[in-house]
Amino acid sequence: MRRPVIAGNWKMHMTCAQARDYMAAFLPQIERAPQDREIVLAPPFTALSTMAAAAEHSVVGLASQNVHWQDHGAFTAEISAEMLLEHGVAYTIVGHSEPRKYFSESDEQINHRARCSQAKGLIPIVCVGESDEQRERGEAERVIRRQIEQGLEGLDANKLVVAYEPIWAIGTGKTCEAAEANRICGLIRSWVGATDLIIQYGGSVKPTNIDELMAMSDIDGVLVGGASLKPDSFARIANYQAI
């Protein structure tokens, strides 16, 4: 039985004070959320301690927005798994389209980050997806399969999450049709060869489309960006009812 993971990625938003206010408004709205799902938030590193305190005794788990594959060293601007574990982090987002784009992250680096996560007891959320140009050229499946094969090499498929995030749908207001997202997620499952693999969809997820997305047979959760920044909006997503 695949347990859906509903994750909100705050990216570079929210101070500690804003995170406290958010949780004060958010937690009461998910008190009666069905227990058949995981609800996760990925704040900036600076807010992890604040979020750990606010989420204590709640159903909300914590994710980091990245992790380095070394335990320590001269890696300016990076963070280690051990540092994250100190704050109660359970998930790590790796391979998101923004680090791939802005910092030229390779599939090999993403694989190192994911392997380290699993070795330390963290669950990597490995992001894959095609650009608008790749989609227009009919290369989407080839690109995603390469990302899967290289990014997931050597990983335990039962201890990770894959997030399919078509880059052209991130922060653009464009949404991949639920049926098409489900088709790609089904392909990913077949390529990995793991029936129980949890696969999320990410890309302009919002309260108005969450129920339809979660009704799809191969979508096991969502990775939410902008719509996770407002507690009312993300609470509605976390409380989805598949139609």
Curated annotation (Swiss-Prot):
Top EC class for this record: isomerase
Domain of life: Bacteria
Catalytic activity: D-glyceraldehyde 3-phosphate = dihydroxyacetone phosphate
Subcellular location, principal: cytoplasm
Compartments, as annotated in UniProt: Cytoplasm
Entry keyword ATP-binding: no
Record key words, sorted: Cytoplasm, Gluconeogenesis, Glycolysis, Isomerase
Positions of substrate binding: N9, W10, K11, G171, S204, G225, G226
GO molecular function, one term: triose-phosphate isomerase activity
Active-site residue list: H96 (electrophile), E165 (proton acceptor)
GO biological process assignments: gluconeogenesis; glyceraldehyde-3-phosphate biosynthetic process; glycerol catabolic process; glycolytic process
NCBIfam families, A to Z: tim
Protein family per UniProt: Belongs to the triosephosphate isomerase family.
Role, per record: Involved in the gluconeogenesis. Catalyzes stereospecifically the conversion of dihydroxyacetone phosphate (DHAP) to D-glyceraldehyde-3-phosphate (G3P).
Subunit comment: Homodimer.
The protein's name: Triosephosphate isomerase
Organism (species): Parasynechococcus marenigrum (strain WH8102)
